[in-house]
UniProtKB/Swiss-Prot annotation:
One of its GO terms (biological process) is 'de novo' pyrimidine nucleobase biosynthetic process. InterPro entries: Asp/Orn_carbamoyltranf_P-bd, Asp/Orn_carbamoylTrfase, Asp/Orn_carbamoylTrfase_sf, Asp_carbamoyltransf, Asp_carbamoyltransf_Asp/Orn-bd. It catalyses: carbamoyl phosphate + L-aspartate = N-carbamoyl-L-aspartate + phosphate + H(+). Keywords: Pyrimidine biosynthesis, Transferase. Catalyzes the condensation of carbamoyl phosphate and aspartate to form carbamoyl aspartate and inorganic phosphate, the committed step in the de novo pyrimidine nucleotide biosynthesis pathway. Belongs to the aspartate/ornithine carbamoyltransferase superfamily. ATCase family. Its EC number is 2.1.3.2. Heterododecamer (2C3:3R2) of six catalytic PyrB chains organized as two trimers (C3), and six regulatory PyrI chains organized as three dimers (R2). This is Aspartate carbamoyltransferase catalytic subunit. The lineage of its organism: Bacteria, Bacillati, Bacillota, Bacilli, Lactobacillales. Carbamoyl phosphate binds at R59, T60, R109, H138, Q141, A266, P267. It comes from Lacticaseibacillus paracasei (strain ATCC 334 / BCRC 17002 / CCUG 31169 / CIP 107868 / KCTC 3260 / NRRL B-441).
């Protein structure tokens, strides 16, 4: 399946893992690999994008902007702190405003889970691309993770994948586990029990960190998200205690399978989720994920552009 085979409605907006099936996942991976190999695309008419990030971001924000510029899109600057949202304007009215002035694609991140549900169709000629909603979904991180795993192993079916850490607060974990389960991977979870959601049982089992580390092909660490905790949770662990009990130490890493890899959505808390030297070690694919993120976001944006017929004469 290629991107040109997508139906017009498949990716008119790109907001959640539920939109992606196994065929479209592989089509996006293949297209991202094309871009990584140097393929380019040209749109006959101008396309305008705005990046509306209401939460702090380094990787996702700059990665989307790089993807937009590589595709030849015109990026319209948007600063939430100096926007009318700070004066009380609703997100829906913000989308209507940028749509009215001609923005085709709004890439958005917001702390509210499912914020995009009220924005889909707010302006008929403006597409919504979700760059992360609270603890809900993170489809572009999901897709770049899939690309990185496929690049390493060439398949998903039968792979053993472990996700460790702050599971209940992680939009990355939610998106990744849904898609990896669809693709036939075996999933294992580990971390503090109070940070685990029983709804994840449908995707895999919850085991100890040492048990998980020795049996997985992909070890995905999650950032400890202090900004989403209440005061009591912040005091649950010191960095040193967390690293010793739930982090990947140098000694624990020695028990990994040959050929197994580390992944992390970043930013990494060095010597908390993962020993600092392992972040830059030969088993780490953390910076490969960042590289792949640009090409995958190019593929995702192109899918939206094709579905909407943007840029056509």
């Amino acid at each position: 399946m290629t991107l040109s085979n997508f139906t017009d409605t498949s990716f008119q907006d790109f907001v959640s893992a539920e939109q992606v099936d196994d065929k479209s996942a592989m089509a996006l991976i293949n297209r991202a690999e094309d871009f990584k190999a140097g393929q380019t695309v040209h749109f006959p008419e101008p396309i305008y994008a705005a990046n509306l990030f209401f939460e702090n971001s380094t990787r996702t924000h700059t990665s989307f902007e790089m993807a937009e510029r590589k595709l030849g899109l015109t990026v319209i600057p948007f600063d939430p702190a100096h926007s009318s949202v700070s004066k009380g304007e609703t997100l829906e009215d913000t989308i209507k405003t940028i749509g009215a002035i001609g923005v085709n694609i709004a890439v958005m991140r917001h702390a509210q889970d499912g914020y995009y549900n009220d924005l889909l169709g707010a302006w008929p000629t403006t597409a919504i691309v979700n760059a992360g909603d609270g603890a809900g979904q993170h489809p572009s991180q999901m897709m770049l993770d899939l690309m990185t795993i496929h690049e390493e192993f060439g398949h998903f079916d039968g792979l053993s994948i472990g996700i460790v850490g702050d599971l209940s607060h992680s939009r990355v974990a939610r998106s990744d586990m849904q898609m990896l389960h669809k693709l036939g991977a075996t999933l294992h979870f580990a971390g503090p029990e109070q940070w685990y959601d029983s709804s994840f049982d449908q995707y895999g089992d919850f085991i100890t960190v040492p048990e998980l580390v020795k049996q997985v092909d992909v070890l995905m660490l999650l950032r400890v998200q202090l900004e989403r905790f209440n005061a009591d949770h912040r005091q649950a662990f010191s960095k040193e205690t967390y690293h010793a009990k739930y982090g990947i130490t140098d000694d624990l890493a020695k028990t990994m399978k040959p050929g197994a890899i580390f992944m992390h959505p970043a930013p990494v808390n060095r010597d908390v989720e993962l020993a600092s030297d392992l972040v830059d070690g030969p088993q780490s694919r953390i910076f490969t994920q960042m590289q792949n993120g640009v090409f995958m976001r190019m593929a995702m944006l192109e899918a939206v552009i094709n579905a909407r017929h943007f840029g056509e004469e």
